[in-house]
Amino acid sequence: MQARIDATLNEHNRPEGSVRLLPVTKFHPVEDIKILQEFGVTAVGENREQEARAKALELPDMDFHMIGQIQSKKANSIARWAAAVHSVDSEKIAEALGRGVALALDRGDRTSDELPCFIQLSLDGDPSRGGTPLSQVTQLADCISDTTHLRFEGLMCVPPLGWGPEKAFSQARDVLSGLEEHFDRSLEFSAGMSGDLVAAIKHGSTIVRVGTEILGNRPLA
């Protein structure tokens, strides 16, 4: 997988190492994550709060990124274990995460006083798949930036159903460029999975989230 990423970077004249691989370990046991650690992996992505929390307790040296949809009632728990959150899609979630980090710090459940947060972008506005509509992205980014203990890190994008990845990632990259101008700094772009990472890297992805091609088919939940 890393060789495929490196080849794509070279093809599109991007520097080696400019894309990070985030293995997705949903449904995979802790033993599989330990194998990844042996190969130098320091961060993985998880979709479900309860599963991720249990794994984080067993593997305190691994960074766990929350990449699944978030319920506000789970924000306090996520704030205890998450090294980053890729799926913030409302001010309510952002503010709940900020409060959760403060509480976790007070209780000694967290060491880092800052939680990097990505906005999950909804290009088609379909609420059933999560994500923030284009019209609300800048407002939410400002909210994250203004929330104590949160750092606005960038955008996360999954192509909408029926969209080609080229179209989706091109539009998302344009949105990200506008945010970089707004904040006057570079931002991260969490985009691309096994089936569309070439298009994502072409359009500037800095983090690709890959599961099956690294660990094989997920065991049944």
Curated annotation (Swiss-Prot):
Superkingdom in the source lineage: Bacteria
Organism in which the protein naturally occurs: Corynebacterium glutamicum (strain ATCC 13032 / DSM 20300 / JCM 1318 / BCRC 11384 / CCUG 27702 / LMG 3730 / NBRC 12168 / NCIMB 10025 / NRRL B-2784 / 534)
Molecular function GO terms recorded: pyridoxal phosphate binding
Keyword Plastid part of the UniProt annotation: no
Transmembrane segments: none
Modified residues (N6-(pyridoxal phosphate)lysine): 26
Lineage, opening ranks: Bacteria, Bacillati, Actinomycetota, Actinomycetes, Mycobacteriales
Stated name of the protein: Pyridoxal phosphate homeostasis protein
Family membership noted in the UniProt record: Belongs to the pyridoxal phosphate-binding protein YggS/PROSC family.
Pfam families in the record: Ala_racemase_N
Keyword annotations from UniProtKB, A to Z: Pyridoxal phosphate
Main function: Pyridoxal 5'-phosphate (PLP)-binding protein, which is involved in PLP homeostasis.
